[in-house]
Swiss-Prot record:
This is Aldehyde dehydrogenase family 2 member B7, mitochondrial. Possesses activity on acetaldehyde and glycolaldehyde in vitro. Residues 1-34 form a transit peptide. It catalyses: an aldehyde + NAD(+) + H2O = a carboxylate + NADH + 2 H(+). Keywords: Mitochondrion, NAD, Oxidoreductase, Transit peptide. InterPro entries: Ald_DH/histidinol_DH (IPR016161), Ald_DH_C (IPR016163), Ald_DH_CS_CYS (IPR016160), Ald_DH_CS_GLU (IPR029510), Ald_DH_N (IPR016162), Aldehyde_DH_dom (IPR015590). Belongs to the aldehyde dehydrogenase family. It comes from Arabidopsis thaliana. GO terms for molecular function: aldehyde dehydrogenase (NAD+) activity. It is found in: Mitochondrion matrix. NAD(+) binds at G278, S279, T280, D281, V282, G283.
């Protein structure tokens, strides 16, 4: 039953309205600007990379799925097929888990010193940097994010995260503590075993690093499932891991769908831990499958509807630019996006006008072109879902300041969209849209905005923009979220833990805190006869 619900959630698709959103309100703001952009997205650039790996990576070898099935991965710029990828299912997960279990129980990986493991991870980081452009091109082709973002931010961050955890590998240790009698008492920090990891499509490389890095540093083996929308970059990364010297079976990569491969990992009796990043609805199902199988440990990084609070003392120009980045980065496809922009009434009108102007200037187009800020959404399902939410916003009475429709006639491009006069109970203010839609809400004082910001089922992150230290500290303490960015946003260094309160997840990724996700603590008590001291 849970598997069927996974299928329902993953296959759900909203149909977009055949009418322009502008026609609903008789609006045509920025029409010439968007007309020029629309013409620019029609001609696509040939990506500077070849697809070499489309099979599953199991036991150190690239292999076809047992069923022989494949599925297409699509170019979001035009909906055309990039490649046919092997479609893993439960049988393939069984093979991958068996390979991971053998590597953990019998292979050289658990017998290596921690220093030897760290050297492999450092070599891997070197290979990432060597292949930076190739990895970035695959990421952009499969996902649609700007190539400059992939090449200058995300692939370097991928290498940085693995260097961070390579440094941790030989610093993981237990403790000794005094007992109440003649005993030697110590703890051992041991790898948890076979870790199942399910990563999303919005940041395939970064989410892979946040999960693989600590798991490998702690000495575990892994079965990783990629998102069906973006399987390609992980397969190249898997090849580079083996070039770095990773033993066969330590990391196994299965491309496939949530209802089959994902559910098989979460419910597998020989998987000791599962980590998932994705929607809250699917996260609940992962938790259910884990509890009904072998009660495996679970880490969940789920949805968000993060408040971005602009206080009355803010420099409006700076606040507009930061709020724009907080929402529109990565086509708005960020779990922690600042998607509820709360602005103090004193500066609200000025902020709205400048936010509208900034959205109209946003450079949207083929992500392989230089200077592009926004590419297409990842697929037709996400594209149609976003357009439906925009329609909801218009019909609910929010004021459409900019955007509101698709851009161009092919591909999954959406105009940068800004709503003002948004009320807390509108769907565009409560639901995770996961797209380039900024909602701007007005507030009067701190007590009010704290209550409204916390009135959400989510609690992943928040942004605060103020020049007052007391205000910053009050909001920092009062907001029920896992991360608060003060006068900045999306600072995601490898050492900074990331995770949510409430329905935004369980546990933390990155930093020292993530190591606990992949370790067991064993207490060892040894009786001593005639000890010299206690």
């Amino acid at each position: 039953m849970a598997s069927r619900r996974v299928s329902s959630l993953l296959s759900r698709s909203f149909m977009s309205s055949s009418r322009s959103i502008f026609s609903l309100r008789g609006m045509n703001r920025g029409a010439q600007r968007y007309s020029n952009l629309a013409a620019a997205v029609e001609n696509t650039i040939t990506p500077p990379v070849k697809v070499e790996h489309t099979q599953l990576l199991i036991g150190g070898r690239f292999v076809d799925a047992v069923s022989g099935k494949t599925f297409p991965t699509l170019d979001p710029r035009n909906g055309e097929v990039i490649a046919q990828v092997s479609e893993g299912d439960a049988e393939d997960v069984n093979r991958a888990v068996a390979a991971a279990r053998k590597a953990f129980d019998e292979g050289p990986w658990p017998k290596m010193t921690a220093y030897e493991r760290s050297k492999i991870l450092f070599r891997f980081a070197d290979l990432i940097e060597k292949h930076n452009d190739e990895i970035a091109a695959l990421e952009t082709w499969d996902n649609g994010k700007p190539y400059e973002q992939s090449a200058q931010i995300e692939v370097p961050m991928l290498a940085r995260v693995f260097r961070y955890y390579a440094g941790w590998a030989d610093k993981i240790h237990g403790m000794t503590m005094p007992g109440d009698g003649p005993h030697h008492v110590q703890t051992l920090h041991e790898p948890i075993g076979v870790a199942g990891q399910i990563i999303p499509w919005n940041f395939p490389l970064l989410m892979l690093s946040w999960k693989l890095g600590p798991a490998l540093a702690c000495g575990n083996t892994v079965v990783l499932k990629t998102a069906e929308q973006t399987p390609l970059s992980a397969l190249l990364v898997g090849k580079l891991l083996h070039e770095a010297g990773l033993p066969d079976g330590v990391v196994n990569i299965v491309s496939g769908f949530g209802a089959t491969a994902g559910a098989a990992i979460a419910s597998h009796m020989d998987v000791d831990k599962v980590a998932f990043t994705g929607s809250t609805d699917v996260g609940k199902i992962i938790l259910e499958l884990a509890s009904k199988s072998n009660l495996k440990a679970v880490t969940l990084e789920l949805g968000g509807k993060s408040p971005f609070i602009v206080c009355e003392d803010a420099d409006v120009d700076q606040a507009v630019e930061l709020a724009h980045f907080a929402l529109f980065f990565n086509q708005g496809q960020c779990c922690c996006a600042g998607s509820r922009t709360f602005v103090h009434e004193r500066v609200y009108d000025e902020f709205v006008e400048k936010a509208k102007a900034r959205a109209l200037k946003r450079n949207v187009g083929d992500p392989f072109k230089s200077g592009i800020e926004q590419g297409p959404q990842v697929d037709s399902e996400q594209f149609n879902k976003i357009l439906k939410y925009i329609k909801h916003g218009v019909e609910a009475g929010a004021t459409l300041q900019a955007g509101g429709d698709r851009l161009g006639s092919k591909g999954y491009y959406i105009q940068p969209t800004v709503f003002s006069d948004v009320k807390d109970d509108m769907l565009i203010a409560t639901d995770e849209i996961f797209g380039p839609v900024q909602t701007i809400l007005k507030f009067k004082d701190l007590d009010e905005v704290i209550a409204r910001a916390n009135n959400s089922r989510y609690g992943l992150a928040a942004g605060v923009f103020t020049q007052n230290l007391d205000t910053a500290h009050r909001l920092m303490r009062a907001l029920r979220v896992g991360t608060v960015w003060i006068n900045c946003f999306d600072v995601l260094d490898a050492s900074i833990p990331f995770g949510g309160y409430k329905m935004s997840g369980i546990g933390r990724e990155k930093g020292i805190y993530s190591l606990n996700n992949y370790l067991q603590v064993k207490a060892v008590v040894t009786s001593l006869k005639n000890p010299a001291w206690l």
